[in-house]
Amino acid sequence: MSCVKTEGVQTDKNPMGMDINTPEIMQPRAPVKPSKELRNGGRVKSNAVAPTGVYLPNNNIQTPNMTSPEYVQLSTAAALTLGLMPGSMYNCSCTRCLNLLLTYPEGCRANCAYCGLARHREADRDYADRNFIRVDWPAVPMTQVAEIVAKQIKEDGDTPFHRMCISMITHPRSDEDTFTVLKTWTDHVSPDDVMISILSNPTTMVRDDLVKLKDMGTDIFTVSMDAATPEIFDRTRGKGVQSPHTWKKYWQTLEEARDIYGKEKFGAHIIIGMGETEYEALSLVQKIVDMGGHSHMFCFFPEQGSLMDHLPATPRDQWRRVQLGRYLMDYAGVRVEQMKFDELGRVKDFGMPKAELDMLVDTGLPFQTSGCPGKFAEDISACDRPYGDSPVSDIASYPFKPEGAHMRKIRQQLDMEKPGESYEQGEEFDDL
């Protein structure tokens, strides 16, 4: 993938020429059931190829039989930072969050329409070879991961990672194996050196699981609501795509996280551009703020192989407005009731004096990746997910502080250009 390639996805307007993705547009395909021999990791289990250390996803060879808790998958950014695979990222020397993903031959048993890990892909490719948030996820022995980070701390006094996050999936073993993976980690690395987050799977969890994870050192507990409304949730994560998740259970788990972890120690993921209005998205943000939590935003991008890979990415105008609104609500005390919206639910006024708003926009902070904080500041995410929701050619969530041409581009997208300043297409890459 080229750093400056658009990858064929338009992000200024959708096919209807609008700067928002409406429900009429964002309809996933119906899932097709794989043949019986390919279900539940049948290809991997029948061939039973033994794993040998690090496995880099390769759809041209037989995938080894790798299983958590002995094995986990890492984001490409984490693997690069650990030195487990070659390469570099545009304007990023490393990622500050070590994202771990549980792995099984059967894969995730959910069928979320926008996700590259969804169950319907069994016929397409084996679980460990599937793309997720636009990148490959190499598989590595969990002990090896923990030993590398422990060695960094011992020899250098520090590690690039501010935080480690275990991403659970929908699988009968994922609850118990999460405890084992976490124990392997804390046996090597103290939570005082690297903070711990859990990206949970509410469908299989009970309240005692949340308590146990906290007792084991977890700092922040997050829930992937993903959809901004119950209707979109059901269409993309529930019965609409033959998937087991329900809005009710996810919201219940978020409330339990509030009670167990406390203020600002829980959060929810929200994907923008799946058919919700900006008002609906920011109303959900407000509910979470009122609970004492934070929202972690993702910009919808059509994941290759998913049931929504034929749909348009979120128009940047829509994304920037929600991104800015979310930051104002989370960190500047603005409430959704202070904002004004048009008849299509688009933000028309952010509820803040123009001079103050301009100063805040100029910091670039609202447009950086949102997630669990690291060691720099509460409003700077350790989980920077480099280019997980956009190509580099049209960055949605900045894994670095946007300045210069990047800020001019953002201001153009917000229709907030400064007098005498303008953005020229592609100028942010002039010095590459």
Describe the function of each predicted region.
Residues 178-193, 245-263, 316-333:
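Alpha-helix-loop-beta-strand connector modules within alpha/beta enzyme cores
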Residues 206-213, 274-290:
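Catalytic cores of alpha/beta
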Residues 195, 199, 203, 239-240, ...:
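Conserved strand-turn element in the central/C-terminal portion of the radical SAM core barrel
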Residues 77-121, 155-156, 163-166:
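N-terminal pre-triad scaffold of radical SAM enzymes
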Residues 3-7, 12-17, 21-29, 33, ...:
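Auxiliary Fe-S-binding modules of radical SAM enzymes
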Residues 120-148, 152-177, 191-206, 218-251, ...:
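Core AdoMet radical
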Residues 109, 118-125, 137, 156, ...:
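Conserved mixed alpha/beta catalytic, RNA-binding, or beta-rich assembly cores of soluble enzyme
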Residues 152-156, 212-216, 259-261:
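Acidic (Asp/Glu)-rich catalytic clusters
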